[in-house]
Amino acid sequence: MSGDERAIADFVQARLSQKHGWGVERIEDTLIATWPGGGSGSGRRILLCGHLDTVPGEEGYQEDEDYLYGLGACDMKGGLAVMLALADEQLMDATTLVFYPCEEVAFERNGLHRLGSREALLADHDVAVLLEPTDGAVELGCQGTLRVRLDLHGRRAHTSRPWMGVNAIDRLGTVLARVNDFDRRSPELGAVVFRESLSPVRVESFVANNVVPDKAALWLNYRFAPDLTIAQAKDRLVAWIAPELTDDDTITLEDAASAGTPNPEGFEALIRRAGSVRAKLGWTDVSFLSGLGVPSVNFGPGDPLLAHSGHERVAKSALVASLAALSSWIGIDRESRTT
């Protein structure tokens, strides 16, 4: 779980330390493993990343002939397993594997963003793959995300005489109706279609059971397409909500992360091998890597629709297929393959 990755980081470090030819560096619970590449590679510098943490939930796992079940099986222990399996191979291209903590929580705790001077190492790559679950498709870019808080004001009164006040909870209804009518765009960018969403995610209002409340708060999460900046997305949302607000109401931006640019350049062979390409619905660290100037995609085993659910699973066949696709794309020296 996020913030409790020490044991799995120790396990991954021990496994990587057994791989001949790999350099392993640890920064807190982030692991960076580097491979120099073979002499007959393409000359590319490839970066593969995966997060160690999971969302909260029930621990334990099960296995049958076809699947592995349990918290994080899909998001994203399957991807981590593929990364470790790649470390068994004699890769043709220079490759860096980064295993990092706290992706599922606040941006400032994310291990990929806490590398300090080592962040330059990430930027010194030609292409990057984030092994998030994509069900074997190559997913380009990612949505941006922002969370805003709306504070609505009314006038307090006794519930036996509600006409003497203005119920702030009643005002939530008109705002929510406006939210429901928001134009959730589906722009086509880089030959893939991004589907926007705007969701109410939290409400608060209470004084006492015999008081008409004079305050109510509503939180909204807007997942926006990569053709908008954070500022543009916020302006678009505020402009839509504003007609239902009074001068006393406020809108506060509490959290935001930029979208990731969809860029298939450098991934043509991987896309052909995967057989499917689409937009990434959701935010991933493709946004962060793209911001460093590294063309990046999402590609990994597991159905993203099962992520964060109470019935996560990953097919063993999906692990094999993802490993085969990445091995083919990077290139393997079969004659020098490690045991």
Placement of each model-derived feature along the sequence:
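Acidic/histidine-rich catalytic neighborhood of metal-dependent amide-processing enzymes
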Residues: 81-147, 190
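Acidic-glycine-rich active-site phosphate/pyrophosphate-binding loop
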Residues: 49-64, 125, 140-151, 297
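Buried hydrophobic packing segments
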Residues: 12, 80-87, 115, 172-175, ...
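Active-site metal-coordination/substrate-binding segment of hydrolases
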Residues: 42-99, 107, 111
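A non-catalytic alpha/beta surface segment that caps or lines the substrate-entry region
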Residues: 1-42
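Fold-independent oxyanion-binding glycine-rich loops
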Residues: 27-29, 50-52, 101-102, 127, ...
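Generic recognition of long tandem-repeat/solenoid scaffolds
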Residues: 31-35, 66-73, 243, 248
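Metal-dependent amide/peptide-bond hydrolase catalytic core
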Residues: 4-7, 23-25, 133-134, 140-141, ...
